[in-house]
């Protein structure tokens, strides 16, 4: 079924996943209508089962609008419904690695985003002031002050959910710095992860950087000091409607190792052990996962959604041909990502 345009969706400037989809729609030149604050209420639109941003309002099989969330499957749906300027490489090997790196951005790099925003005083103060004002520009100062206190308290008390605490803070922060240094080297060679046109993984990385590099003061200073190229890249990706999206814009699979080996090693160093420990804890019915990441203790509540993430990664690997599976295994050898494809 062809989707009607403009696509309607609810979002917020401080939501990285809103920014992910907004930039992707701009790049793909898909008309959209972004609803901020109470604009979605005025439209009398359906409510999502889980209140996440962004929320898209799309017709179901009966033609009735339904609220749809989760950026990763939405991107794949739009790849089917809109032709041209696709963000999923055609090569199955690139498709799999792109999916893995998109998941890393969505699920691991976001830990740094939440951590910095609600762990340090300067970041807490800025987010507390600005987030309510994005939703309520016309609210009174008194009401906004109340919202500032409410938002900050709610988010700080929920930091443990994403794994940010005094034990894990050094792991998260060191991982963020390494990511910046690795990504800086990649975009010195080529503009995007897979060449000269963006993939969905680029938009996932960009999404977190709209906050880490461009909004929250502590990680923004780190980015500006250590990787100003990444800081500038985030501005560029904001609107890629002028990118030519050349047919040969994605690199070949034989170039993946030279370009992405360090990034894949970082994924294997941090995100993979978290995924595996989470899955193991869930299998045992435990409420908390404990493991070692980067040689240090990691403790956080089990995360059912990331249990699904591991299943989806392995399912996508299983869909590859035997030859492509062999190529991926060879590519991931020595990166720490091997368990993702050896126990699937």
Model regions and ranges:
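Structural signal for well-ordered, non-membrane alpha-helices
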Residues: 106, 180-184, 238
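Short N-terminal edge-element motif at the start of the domain
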Residues: 159-195
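A non-catalytic, amphipathic alpha-helix used as a structural packing/dimerization or gating element
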Residues: 93, 97-100, 171-178, 182, ...
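GST superfamily/GST-like fold recognition
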Residues: 193-213
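Active-site/pore-lining binding-face segments in mid-to-C-terminal subdomains
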Residues: 206-297
